[in-house]
Amino acid sequence: SGIDIALWDIFGKITGQPIGRFFGGRLREKVMPYASLLMDEPKIMNANLTELRGQGFKAFKIGWGTFGRIDTANDELLVKSARKVIGDDCFLAVDAGGSDAYWRGNLRWAINASKMLADYNVGWFEEALRPDDLADFIELRKQSPVPISGCEVLTRRQSFTPFIAERAFDIIQPDVTKVG
């Protein structure tokens, strides 16, 4: 992937064109950048969120850390705390980090977590399950009140096909450094 990205960069520089033009051009005029940070102990996370809010960020993704790894009270404390710090006027997404080799979250946990996240107006719930758990992602998407995202760790187009065909996600997130 690194070589592929570098070659496209060189091609864009040689032609004097943004490489997006070679892939069909601009789809929108603006994108929403978001600050991404670990769900650390609330005091530390809140300090980081406050600093990032002060830098002008209006969208945030909090993830990994202890979320889904201790208990549901801890999960809600983290999300409630983040929402309080950034306010209701900011976008908030949550990444459970289900691609972690030691991830224990299951479908029941993910459904319950998604309902809790809806209470805090979370924009999407990312990696709520292990990355290859197609059947559970399909069921989670059916039951979740918040959009479900994933596919970040998949590396080949064939890996994406069943998730797309079965509509397992509301948001597909390929990582260009992994898929080439």
Model-found features: residue ranges?
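Residue-level "edge-of-site" marker
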Residues: 25, 65, 98, 128-130, ...
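Conserved beta-strand positions in the central sheet of alpha/beta enzyme cores
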Residues: 59-61, 126, 173
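A structural motif
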Residues: 57, 122, 168-169
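Hydrophobic alpha-helical scaffolding
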Residues: 1, 72, 103, 127, ...
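A short, conserved beta-to-alpha structural element at the edge of catalytic cores
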Residues: 120-129
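N-terminal capping/lid subdomain adjacent to the active-site entrance of alpha/beta enzymes
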Residues: 1-119, 135, 143
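Catalytic alpha/beta core domains of metabolic enzymes, predominantly
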Residues: 131-180
